[in-house]
């Protein structure tokens, strides 16, 4: 069915196709049965939470938490919804989502379009969970005090989420990445940490970082008591691309991001000295790529664009491949493979 659906979905506008996919997953989540088995070798504990497996859905796929159960049914060990802002916002003008099919990539300039925290949180609270639920929060584009928006989002999401992610990595909200350095970063992390209560707090940062910025983020996150770093998001860089849409503005995700994302994972592993769990995201579309990131230091991995090209069977395939690869290398548990190269 997935191979039949893809040509139909690829024949229409990317954002319309995404909306239809969310509708289908939302419906299937209410009646469907899980597609993927959960090998007993794959649980991973991060920040006191035991994830059934290390594979998570990255934020951006289910912005408003409409298909949480459906995504869990595909086999994900974690589903991260959002980015959610305190107030609803429309985001940037359409078209704003572009497939780069020859490159197995996507460019987006969505701009934190979402229905707001108040609409999404009741759905998140009611959703059936078979793994860890992350809620990714951000600031409204026109907020007078963006740090206050994060503070509000963390406080609102913390009682419902298994973990909350502060997203300061998006390139599509002007000035947002300025929160990744200097006094603004220190203030943001301190206020967010005070607002989260006992709920684990993750920080999502961009892959477009210089060495000094990486060191600064690592020090600030450790000092503030952040529980994990998600490295990273889409990139504003443009490696060699062959698609007609390659010149569109926005953040690039998918296969061309893999090299940069893997390097940033190694950079943050060095900068944190192993003091913080790392979540790898960017260009992960196979069990081999997920396993390579885990061996390079990631406790968890996430994907989104991989689903666009790999379809709904991809999470289950990655889970099976992880189990095979770790056993091939003599590991009894996937946790034993973390950071072994």
PLM features per residue range, with description:
Residues 22, 26-29, 33-37, 170-184, ...:
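Glycine/Thr-rich beta-alpha phosphate-binding loop at enzyme active sites
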Residues 60-62, 84, 138-142, 169-171, ...:
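Active-site beta-loop-alpha junctions enriched in small/polar residues
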Residues 87-96, 117-119, 125-126, 172-198, ...:
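Active-site-adjacent beta->alpha loops and helix N-cap segments on the catalytic face
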Residues 1-133, 141:
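N-terminal capping/small domains of soluble enzymes
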Residues 64-73, 151, 209-223, 270-274, ...:
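Catalytic cores of alpha/beta
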Residues 75-89, 168-170, 227-238, 290-317:
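Glycine-rich phosphate-binding active-site loops on the catalytic face of alpha/beta enzymes
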Residues 49-56, 129-137, 195-209, 268-280:
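Short beta-strand/loop segments at the ligand-binding rim of alpha/beta enzyme cores
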Residues 1-35, 96-122, 252-277, 285-341:
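Alpha/beta catalytic cores of nucleotide-metabolism and tRNA/nucleoside-modifying enzymes
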């Amino acid at each position: 069915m997935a191979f039949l659906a893809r040509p139909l979905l690829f024949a229409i506008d990317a954002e319309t196709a995404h909306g239809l996919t969310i509708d289908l997953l939302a419906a299937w989540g209410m009646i469907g049965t899980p597609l993927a088995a959960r090998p007993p070798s794959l649980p991973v504990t991060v920040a006191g939470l035991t994830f059934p497996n290390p594979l998570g859905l990255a934020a951006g796929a289910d912005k408003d938490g409409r298909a949480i159960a459906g995504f869990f049914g595909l086999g994900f060990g974690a589903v991260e919804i959002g980015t959610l802002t305190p107030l609803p916002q429309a985001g940037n003008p359409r078209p704003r989502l572009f497939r780069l099919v020859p490159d197995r990539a996507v460019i987006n300039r969505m701009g934190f379009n979402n229905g707001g925290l108040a609409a999404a949180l009741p759905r998140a609270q009611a959703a059936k969970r078979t793994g860890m639920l992350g809620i990714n929060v951000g600031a409204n584009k026109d907020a007078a005090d963006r740090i206050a928006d994060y503070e509000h989002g963390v406080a609102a999401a913390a009682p419902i989420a298994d973990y909350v992610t502060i997203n300061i990595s998006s390139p599509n909200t002007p000035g947002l990445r300025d929160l990744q350095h200097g006094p603004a970063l220190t203030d943001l992390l301190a206020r967010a940490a005070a607002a989260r209560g006992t709920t684990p707090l993750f920080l999502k940062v961009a892959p477009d970082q210089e060495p000094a910025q990486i060191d600064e983020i690592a020090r600030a996150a450790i000092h503030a008591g952040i529980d994990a770093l998600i490295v990273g998001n889409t990139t504003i860089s443009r490696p060699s691309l062959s698609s007609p849409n390659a010149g569109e503005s926005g953040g690039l995700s998918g296969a061309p991001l893999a090299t940069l994302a893997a390097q940033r994972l190694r950079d943050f592993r060095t900068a944190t000295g192993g003091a913080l769990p790392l979540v790898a995201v960017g260009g992960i579309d196979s069990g081999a790529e997920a396993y390579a990131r885990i061996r390079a230091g990631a406790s968890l991995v996430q994907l989104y664009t991989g689903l666009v090209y790999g379809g709904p069977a991809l999470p289950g395939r990655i889970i099976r491949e992880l189990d095979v690869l770790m056993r091939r290398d003599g590991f009894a548990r996937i946790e034993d493979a973390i950071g072994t190269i």
